[in-house]
């Protein structure tokens, strides 16, 4: 019997969610994703400290943000030596409400990849799914730079990304789960909210069905998993990005994996087509307390880790 990881790959593209490129090969994912927190975690390990030091030294005298981008691209290139597909590299979260600055930073990151001989099709630029981030991604896609819209918690964020022609979105399963669990407090029933009933799983499944029903080409990549049950409940999703710890658990199990998301069922679901302009997007996001809180919290956390990476580089 093959492992759950190999069975899952029959239904879904498996992506490694880590900056630790030495770990990736064991799981043979197609793609990999990084974010400021994962890069910070990697460079804090002795095995990766020389990579940070060498990159910073080679570009000493350049502006700090330019050196940071060099570090991100260095990690991305190392990852692309291991995976056959794409790597996602994130724009500084402190630019999440500045569309023009996000576009400029994304263009610079892509230019650095191209200077290393990496084709555009192998890179996704990660951007927080704020209104400004979505507009930046729309402009970038128009110029052939593909984007991965992250920190996605609300249905309106997903629909707006699809309308804007974004290549890929990353709805966050685990963080949605966390919010609902905390909000319920003592009333939370873990068993009743597991698998297909998990609020994070339900959110991704709703987005995936909507995109299939209306022929939206944006790829849906479930992210931020807390356990393998959440992952298996989304078998059939376009892509799932999974931490090395959970990849190892899937690799160690030979229990049967079944397709959970069905295209035919999606095509016949009762979803109604929606469209958002800036005003209706902001109102819909504001009406979703979970998404509003988690988006803000996520941007703050990534900004803190980006600032910490800045300090590490400045200290070299």
Swiss-Prot record:
Q: Which residues form a coiled coil?
A: none
Tell me which SUPFAM superfamilies the record gives: Aldolase
* Sorted UniProt keywords: Cytoplasm, Pentose shunt, Schiff base, Transferase
**Mind listing the GO biological process terms from this record?**
carbohydrate metabolic process; pentose-phosphate shunt
InterPro entries xrefs: Aldolase_TIM, TAL/FSA, Transaldolase_1, Transaldolase_AS
**Pathway terms, separated by semicolons:** Carbohydrate degradation; pentose phosphate pathway; D-glyceraldehyde 3-phosphate and beta-D-fructose 6-phosphate from D-ribose 5-phosphate and D-xylulose 5-phosphate (non-oxidative stage): step 2/3
Annotated active site residues, numbered on this chain, are 126 (schiff-base intermediate with substrate)
Which Gene3D superfamilies does this UniProt record tie to the protein? Aldolase class I
- Known EC number(s)? 2.2.1.2
Record field: catalytic activity: D-sedoheptulose 7-phosphate + D-glyceraldehyde 3-phosphate = D-erythrose 4-phosphate + beta-D-fructose 6-phosphate
An example Gene Ontology molecular-function term: transaldolase activity
Q: Name one Pfam family in it.
A: TAL_FSA
Give the family this protein belongs to, as stated in its UniProt record: Belongs to the transaldolase family. Type 1 subfamily.
The entry describes its oligomerization and partners as: Homodimer.
What name has this protein been given in UniProt? Answer: Transaldolase
The record lists the organism as Methylibium petroleiphilum (strain ATCC BAA-1232 / LMG 22953 / PM1)
């Amino acid at each position: 019997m093959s492992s759950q990881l190999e069975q899952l790959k029959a239904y879904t593209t498996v992506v490694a969610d880590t900056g630790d490129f030495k770990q990736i090969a064991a799981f043979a994912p197609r793609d990999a994703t990084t974010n400021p927190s994962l890069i910070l975690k990697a460079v804090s390990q002795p095995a990766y400290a020389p990579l940070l030091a060498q990159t910073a030294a080679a570009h000493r005298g350049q502006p700090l943000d330019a050196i940071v981008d060099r570090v991100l691209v260095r990690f991305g290139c190392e990852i692309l030596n291991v995976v056959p597909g794409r790597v996602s590299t994130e724009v500084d979260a402190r630019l999440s409400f500045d569309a023009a600055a996000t576009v400029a930073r994304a263009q610079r990151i892509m230019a650095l990849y191209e200077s290393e001989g990496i084709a555009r099709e192998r890179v996704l630029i990660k951007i927080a799914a704020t209104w400004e981030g979505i507009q930046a991604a729309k402009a970038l896609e128009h110029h052939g730079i593909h984007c991965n819209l992250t920190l996605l918690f609300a249905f309106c964020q997903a629909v707006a990304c699809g309308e804007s022609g974004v290549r890929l979105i990353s709805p966050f399963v685990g963080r949605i789960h966390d919010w609902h669990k905390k909000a319920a407090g003592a009333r939370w029933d873990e068993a009743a909210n597991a698998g297909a009933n998990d609020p994070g799983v339900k959110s991704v499944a709703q987005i995936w069905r909507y995109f299939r029903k209306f022929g939206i080409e944006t790829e849906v990549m479930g992210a931020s998993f807390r356990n393998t049950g959440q992952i298996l409940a989304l078998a059939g999703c376009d892509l799932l990005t999974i931490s090395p710890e959970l990849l190892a658990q899937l690799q160690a199990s030979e229990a049967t994996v079944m397709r959970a998301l069905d295209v035919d069922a999606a095509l016949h679901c009762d979803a109604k087509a929606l469209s958002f302009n800036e005003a209706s997007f902001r109102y819909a996001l504001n009406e979703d307390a979970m998404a509003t809180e988690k988006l803000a919290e996520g941007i703050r956390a990534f900004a803190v880790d980006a600032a910490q990476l800045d300090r590490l580089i400045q200290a070299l």
